[in-house]
């Protein structure tokens, strides 16, 4: 019997590295080092893109281990793709009443989406197993691509305009988290074979 609660095997390592990267992103954002904040957010997204494949490589997972994996992945995703982007945007300048309400709404939509995913995934695991082929709505991990791409605009836009445009961007992404539309999951094996 283990002296620690939880499940400890290689299947959770990338999830924990993703969390570590997201927390690092928040630290860098709070210090005004936005380049490294975005870099670590992207690293978090990269880890999240591959953690499912790592999990599926372990064939002898218990039902408790599977349930733990679903929960720990979503909890880490909430910090990585809910809190870290909101913290980044706050320190960049999405502030004031409107900005704070938008960031609150963004975090709320991320947590709703992740909780809904947990319910659907637990049901799906009992009936189907394997990898899911579609998302319901925009996955929270998408912010680790959307936000860095948007940040490229800071090199061509005045700072006040860049910050002003972050407001509707985060609002739109939040709505896309909870809007129910099918999004085909990218097949990483096919993507990597075409590179």
Predicted segments, located by residue:
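Cytosolic, membrane-interface loops and tails of multi-pass inner-membrane proteins
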Residues: 1-2, 51-66, 117-133
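Lipid-exposed faces of alpha-helical membrane segments in multi-pass integral membrane proteins
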Residues: 14-20, 40-43, 79-82, 104-108, ...
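Transmembrane alpha-helical segments that form the membrane-embedded catalytic/substrate-channel core
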Residues: 48, 107-120, 171-186
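Topogenic membrane-insertion module of multi-pass membrane proteins
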Residues: 1-52, 176-195
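Hydrophobic, well-structured mid-protein blocks that either form specific transmembrane helices
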Residues: 94-140
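C-terminal membrane-associated helical module and adjoining short loops/tails
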Residues: 127-195
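Multi-pass membrane catalytic core of lipid/isoprenoid biosynthesis enzymes
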Residues: 11-16, 57-114
């Amino acid at each position: 019997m283990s002296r620690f609660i939880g499940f400890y095997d290689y299947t959770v390592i990338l999830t924990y590295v993703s969390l570590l990267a997201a927390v690092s992103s928040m630290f860098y954002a709070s210090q005004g080092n936005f380049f490294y904040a975005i870099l670590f957010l992207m690293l978090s997204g990269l880890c999240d893109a591959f953690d499912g494949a790592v999990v599926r490589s372990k064939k002898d997972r218990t039902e408790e281990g599977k349930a733990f994996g679903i929960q720990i992945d979503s909890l880490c995703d909430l910090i990585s793709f809910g809190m870290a982007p909101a913290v980044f945007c706050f320190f960049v300048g999405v502030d004031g009443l409107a900005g704070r309400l938008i960031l609150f709404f963004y975090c709320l939509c991320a947590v709703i989406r992740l909780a809904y995913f947990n319910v659907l995934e637990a049901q799906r695991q009992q009936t189907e197993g394997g990898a899911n082929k579609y998302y319901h709505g925009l996955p929270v991990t998408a912010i680790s691509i959307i936000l860095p791409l948007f940040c490229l605009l800071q090199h061509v836009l005045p700072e006040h305009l860049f910050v002003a445009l972050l407001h509707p961007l985060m609002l739109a992404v939040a709505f896309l988290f909870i809007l129910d539309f099918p999004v085909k999951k990218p097949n990483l094996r096919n993507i990597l074979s075409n590179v």
